[in-house]
């Protein structure tokens, strides 16, 4: 081994020395003052509540929430340039591909105002109508909300819905216009629109660009000044609200909480107040923006808990966590104000390969922890075999759940057409709840009740006529109309939920050239003249194709489905009738023509009686085949007939 001589050793700088810049060359301007001392300040927990600000960003889908959150992460120094990526907080592949936020994410940010260090907890929320429950749970953990509006598009229906959710919880609202760098931006006009709705002055509306970062530091300053600090009693028994929970393959259930009273430390025994289940805390930590273990969480702080529990039903969103280890004991009463999310749409999910049924059950178990609103129960279909009847918040929720099952768990699935929940009163006085057309009672039905929703549509005023026509064709009743500005109008309708869960949104977008936005909320139920339409193949009902539709549109639905199945089902050796029926009454019919083998091909000339004999023999065979033959519906036909597009045709109920 060669060793360099002492002269060479002296001349060569040490590895440590090479890292240190010369005092003369040190650039004192970079990095900014904001970054160095504070990140270490934010990593310490048990921060005084007066120095904490909990806030969320609420906006319509695609108004730039995640991009603004990216700029905040960079500006506060918690993510460096090298590890930065677009939509940093959107962790799922589906979120990144579709450019939407599905899960609410939280992150702890350091910030300094007037030489005082603060900790900001930012909760990035989804904007789509299906994920309103994610927004409501994020709002429970905050004292303030940044209301973000696209300076080129203005206020949309979803913005209003989330704003009302925030006002219900008495959150302080900071109005902000985003995308002011766009050539099409009109900030003055939309600032006046926001001021009109919130009740502030147009000058108070902040203007930022999530893309360039312009105005973001001013926004963070305003969050510190305007959002009230969290209130809570540090000496009271521990109470923390679960606002999200995820399943980690290696660590089990990771529960995200906001501490309201007391404090939480590792190695304590905690209790979930709704179930009474107790666990030992293995780890307590903060998200900044990657998870970091810490000594514990104090009043007003947001972080995560790991108990090592693998059962996905042990950590319910909206539940209250309390500590059993402290001298003060467990809390006497749970936190209030959270509603369990209720499924609005039901659909059957079946594995294409029947042997995947146990895998589908395990996959749904794991997804349910991430997704508090997903419900499911086993069901059997004659046509599709074993599967699950799943409850979803809406059609996008259903599509994304199915896509996650297929992508994350490698399953191949068929989903049946979506249904809402109907209440059916029979003549004998009994009442049943129907989420599946195959549960529809046969015989005398006195009344049927269907869920209705209050729908808000915001669109340019030139499209009023076409929107009204669409809503009336879907049995909607106009509740009111307001002009937000001379160019934009808000329409309020009461509509059956069954009419809007299929293709209403697509039809609305196509009729308004994509300018309309939609929001809906539950509004009870109403009596309706509904019937069950069965699709019969060879005289036998195929349960997967049955649907509950309004009496006036049953004939159109029957026609549409029989025509579609005639194209999708391959021809058999015998003629197959495809019929649509209400009870025993046939309302539509198509025939799938038989494939005919040429039995005369071997007869070259000869007597006609020979040919007739062969044809009669073929006819007898076809007749016998028709009585004993079964129609095999290929998997592709089920997929095509039950796809969302096909369901969209059914939406004309």
Curated annotation (Swiss-Prot):
It catalyses: GTP + H2O = GDP + phosphate + H(+). Its main location: membrane. Signal peptide: none annotated. Residues 1-30 are annotated as: Disordered. This is Elongation factor 4. It comes from Mycobacterium tuberculosis (strain ATCC 25618 / H37Rv). The keyword Cell membrane applies. Keywords: Cell membrane, GTP-binding, Hydrolase, Membrane, Nucleotide-binding, Protein biosynthesis. GO terms for biological process: positive regulation of translation. It is found in: Cell membrane.
């Amino acid at each position: 081994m060669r060793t360099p001589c002492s002269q060479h050793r002296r001349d060569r700088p040490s590895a440590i020395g090479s890292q240190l810049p010369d005092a003369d060359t040190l650039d004192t301007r970079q990095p900014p003052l904001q970054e160095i001392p504070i990140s270490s300040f934010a990593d310490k927990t048990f921060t005084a509540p007066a120095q904490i600000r909990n806030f969320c960003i609420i906006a319509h889908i695609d108004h730039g929430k995640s991009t603004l959150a990216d700029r905040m992460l960079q500006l506060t120094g918690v993510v460096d340039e090298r590890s930065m990526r677009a939509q940093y907080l959107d962790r799922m592949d589906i979120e990144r591909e579709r450019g939407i936020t599905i899960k609410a994410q939280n992150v702890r940010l350091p910030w300094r105002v007037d030489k005082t260090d603060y900790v900001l907890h930012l909760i990035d929320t989804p904007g789509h109508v299906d994920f309103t429950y994610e927004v409501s749970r994020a709002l429970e953990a905050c004292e303030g909300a940044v209301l973000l509006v696209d300076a080129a598009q203005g206020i949309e229906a979803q913005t209003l819905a989330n704003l009302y959710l925030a006002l219900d919880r008495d959150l302080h609202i900071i109005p902000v216009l985003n995308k002011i760098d766009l050539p099409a931006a009109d900030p003055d006009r939309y600032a006046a629109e926001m001021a009109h709705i919130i009740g502030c002055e147009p000058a108070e509306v902040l203007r930022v660009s999530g893309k360039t970062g312009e105005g973001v530091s001013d926004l963070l300053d305003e969050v510190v000044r305007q959002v009230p600090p969290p209130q809570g009693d540090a000496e009271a028994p521990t109470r923390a609200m679960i606002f999200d929970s995820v399943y980690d393959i290696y660590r089990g259930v990771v529960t995200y909480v906001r501490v309201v009273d007391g404090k939480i430390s590792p190695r304590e025994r905690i209790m979930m107040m709704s179930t009474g289940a107790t666990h030992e805390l293995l780890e307590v930590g903060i998200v900044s923006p990657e998870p970091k273990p810490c000594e514990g969480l104090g009043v007003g702080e947001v972080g995560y808990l790991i108990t090592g529990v693998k059962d996905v039903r042990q950590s319910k969103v909206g539940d209250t966590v309390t500590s059993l280890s402290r001298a003060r004991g467990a809390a006497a009463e749970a936190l209030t104000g959270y509603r369990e999310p209720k499924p609005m749409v039901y659909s059957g999910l079946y594995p294409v390969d029947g042997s995947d049924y146990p895998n589908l059950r395990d996959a749904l178990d794991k997804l349910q922890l991430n997704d508090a609103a997903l419900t499911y129960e086993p069901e059997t279909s004659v046509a599709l075999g074993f599967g699950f009847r799943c409850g979803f918040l809406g059609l996008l929720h259903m599509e994304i759940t199915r896509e996650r099952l297929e992508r994350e768990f490698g399953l191949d699935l068929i989903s049946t057409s979506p249904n809402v929940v109907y209440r059916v009163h029979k003549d004998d006085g009994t009442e049943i709840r129907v989420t599946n057309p195959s549960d529809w009672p046969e015989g005398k039905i006195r009344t049927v009740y269907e869920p209705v929703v209050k729908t808000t549509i915001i669109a340019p005023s030139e499209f009023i006529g076409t929107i009204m026509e669409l809503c009336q064709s879907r049995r909607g009743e106009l509740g009111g109309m307001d002009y937000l500005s001379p160019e934009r109008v808000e329409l309020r309708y009461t509509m059956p939920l069954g009419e809007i869960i299929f293709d209403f949104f697509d039809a609305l977008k196509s009729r308004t050239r994509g300018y309309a936005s939609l929001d809906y909320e539950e509004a009870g139920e109403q009596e309706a003249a509904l019937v069950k339409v069965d699709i019969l193949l060879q005289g036998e009902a195929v349960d997967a194709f049955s649907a509950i539709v309004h009496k006036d549109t049953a004939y159109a639905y029957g026609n549409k489905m029989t025509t579609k199945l005639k194209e999708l089902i391959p021809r058999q050796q015998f003629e197959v009738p495809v019929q649509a029926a209400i009870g025993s009454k046939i309302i539509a019919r198509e025939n799938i023509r038989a494939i005919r083998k040429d039995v005369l091909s071997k007869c070259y000339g000869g007597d006609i009686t020979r040919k007739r004999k062969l044809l009669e023999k073929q006819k007898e065979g076809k007749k016998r085949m028709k009585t004993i033959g079964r129609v095999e519906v290929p998997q592709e036909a089920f997929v095509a007939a039950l796809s969302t597009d096909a369901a969209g045709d059914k939406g004309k109920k």
